[in-house]
Amino acid sequence: MLLMSPVFKRSLMFGLPVAALVIAAAWRLSAVTAVEPSGGHRSLFELPVETLDGQLSTLEAYRGQVALVVNVASECGLAYQYPELEVLFQRYRDHGFVILAFPSNDFWQEPNDNAGIQQVCAARGVTFPVFGRSHIRGKDRSAVYEFLADTGETPLWNFAKYLVGRDGRPRAFFGSLVSPDSEALSRAIERALAESDPLEAQIR
């Protein structure tokens, strides 16, 4: 009969739940989930945002495009995704695709102010739209992330990705560890791009 010491028993008792939590978190960081908002605003494109220049604006200029909304952070270990996101943007931009990046210090890895973020993005060759630093979690989260939270998915870390259709409604959520060059993301973008533009449909 195998005898276990009290110390080993305690370690096992606490270690297994912790391991389960780590595995669950890792799975969510790599998750690809179809999503749909439950209420609130009808479209991402009607929401207010703050630009890197500190001006209040909206996302109206991107209405009718497929958008990938990403929470970014300059000092995150996943910041290598910046150039990968740029490649993705260049691949699909002429087909009606845009990446909308929202810097946040909610995970303590974006210490820069808006001016500093501009410098970082310029140094990394980023040409897709980047907005002012904001909250993406909690009671102070921005209107954009309040809207996206209605999908039931919230970022666990930097570089989580929401794919939004031409109608401004979320289509899918991709965890932080899903690479911008992943086949799953490319397929989802292409499916969304194949959907008809709701503005053109109204004109017809």
Predicted regions and their residues:
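N-terminal secretory signal peptides that target proteins for export/translocation
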Residues: 1-7
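Hydrophobic membrane-insertion alpha-helices, especially the h-region
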Residues: 13-26
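Thiol-/selenol-based redox modules, centered on thioredoxin-like
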Residues: 143-146, 150-204
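Structural microenvironment flanking redox-active thiols in thiol-disulfide oxidoreductases
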Residues: 78-141
